[in-house]
A protein has these predicted regions:
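Terminal amphipathic alpha-helical/low-complexity segments used for targeting or macromolecular assembly
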Residues: 1-105, 166, 171, 177-178, ...
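Structural signal for interior beta-strand "rungs" in well-ordered beta-sheet cores
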Residues: 43, 101-312
Length: 340
C-alpha cells in the first residue's frame, strides 16, 4: 500500500492539467468514487456516476471540465479522467523491483548472455544461448528455453515458461503461469498409427510493450511463427493456437480462444470468452462482444455479437424449443404462401 503523499498542485503538474481548490491539500491514496475520503483522490469518468460524487467527500476529484461545477472541493480538470487515473495508479503504487543479481539457486547456462541490470530470482532455469536484455526481471521459478531472446526492461513473473527459440521484445510483461512456445496442436490421422504428431517447426514472436496475463498459452507455429505485435494486451486464460497473428494495439479479454492460422488485425477489441475459428482474417478496428463465436472472415470493421443474452429460465426453455422448430416453421410458412 502506498505511503506517498502528493499535493493538489503536484498532481495537477504531473498530469499536465489545470486544477481548482487548495493547492497545498495532500492525499495519500486513490479510492473509488463512492467512498473516497479527504485523504484520497478519486475520478469521475462518466455522467452516470455523478450521483456517487454527490454522496462522497474526496480530497481531490479528477473530472472533465464540463463536470467542474458538480463538485466544489479540490478538483483536477482532465480531458480523459480514466487515463489520468491510470497514470496516477503508477505514481501512487510503483512496482517493487528484484535485486539486480542472479540468485544463487538459479541455473544459468554458461552460454547464456545476460545484459547489465538483469535480475534473476530463485530457482529459475535459463538455457543455452539465451539472450536477456538490460533491466529485465526474471522472477522465481521461471524457465527460459534454449536460444530464446528476451528484450530490455521486461518483467517475467513467477513460473513463466518460455520454450526454445521464442523471441520477446522490449518492455514486455508476462504474468505467472503463462506458457509461450509450446507445441501447436498439429496431428495427422493415420489408419495404422492413430494420430501422427506434426512437429512444430516455427516459433513465437512477441513485439514491444505487450502484456500477457496469467495462465495464458501461446503455441509455436507449425511452419509460420505465431505473432503478437507491438502494444497488444492479452488477459488471463487466453489461448492463441499455432500460426495466429495478433495485430498492433489489439486488446483480448479473458478466456478467448483463437484457432490456428487466424489473423486478427490492429486495434481490435475481443470481449471475454470470444471464440474464433481457424484460418480466418479479422479486419482492423473490429470489436467482438463477450461470448461471440466467429466462424467467418470479417472484412468490414464494426461491432459484432452472437451470444444470446440472459433470460429468465422458463422463457429461455420456451425459446430454445422454438429455435429447434425454426426450420419446420419456415417450411410451413413457405407452403402457406404458395397456397395463397
Amino acid at each position: 500500500v502506498s505511503t506517498k503523499s502528493f499535493s493538489l498542485a503536484e498532481l495537477a503538474e504531473f498530469l499536465g492539467c489545470e486544477y481548482r481548490g487548495d493547492a497545498t491539500h495532500r492525499v495519500t491514496a486513490i479510492a473509488p468514487l463512492s467512498d473516497a475520503s479527504d485523504s484520497q483522490i478519486t475520478f469521475l469518468a462518466q455522467d452516470k456516476y455523478l450521483a456517487q460524487l454527490a454522496g462522497t467527500s474526496p480530497g481531490i476529484v479528477v473530472l472533465r471540465e464540463k463536470h467542474a461545477a458538480a463538485y466544489s472541493g479540490n478538483r483536477i480538470l482532465a480531458a480523459d479522467p480514466y487515463l489520468a487515473y491510470a497514470r496516477l495508479s503508477a505514481l501512487f503504487n510503483p512496482r517493487s523491483s528484484l535485486p539486480k543479481e542472479i540468485h544463487p539457486t538459479a541455473i544459468v547456462d554458461s552460454s547464456a548472455v545476460l545484459a547489465d541490470g538483469v535480475a534473476v530470482g530463485p530457482n529459475c532455469v535459463i538455457g543455452a544461448n539465451v539472450r536477456v536484455g538490460q533491466g529485465t526481471e526474471i522472477h522465481a521459478g521461471t524457465v527460459i528455453g534454449e536460444a530464446t531472446v528476451v528484450g530490455d526492461n521486461c518483467r517475467l513473473y513467477p513460473r513463466v515458461t518460455l520454450y526454445d527459440r521464442v523471441t520477446i521484445g522490449d518492455k514486455v510483461t508476462i504474468h505467472s503461469g503463462a506458457v509461450i512456445g509450446a507445441d501447436g496442436f498439429g496431428f495427422a490421422p493415420s489408419k495404422t498409427d492413430g494420430w501422427v504428431k506434426i512437429e512444430q517447426l516455427a516459433s513465437v514472436r512477441i513485439g514491444n510493450n505487450v502484456e500477457i496475463g496469467a495462465n495464458t498459452t501461446i503455441d509455436r507455429g507449425a511452419l509460420h511463427d505465431t505473432v503478437v505485435e507491438d502494444g497488444a494486451i492479452i488477459d488471463n486464460l487466453v489461448h492463441l493456437a499455432h500460426g495466429v497473428s495478433i495485430g498492433e494495439g489489439t486488446a483480448i479479454a479473458a478466456c478467448v480462444g483463437i484457432a490456428g492460422s487466424t489473423t486478427v488485425g490492429k486495434n481490435c477489441l475481443l470481449g471475454g470468452a470470444v471464440g474464433i475459428s481457424g484460418h480466418l482474417h479479422i479486419a482492423d478496428n473490429t470489436q467482438f462482444h463477450g461470448g461471440t463465436v466467429v466462424t467467418r472472415h470479417v472484412s468490414e470493421p464494426g461491432s459484432y455479437a452472437s451470444a444470446a443474452p440472459m433470460q429468465e429460465v422458463r422463457a429461455w426453455r420456451r425459446n430454445s424449443v422454438r429455435y429447434t422448430q425454426l426450420d419446420e416453421m419456415a417450411y410451413r410458412l413457405r407452403k402457406l404462401e404458395k397456397e395463397q
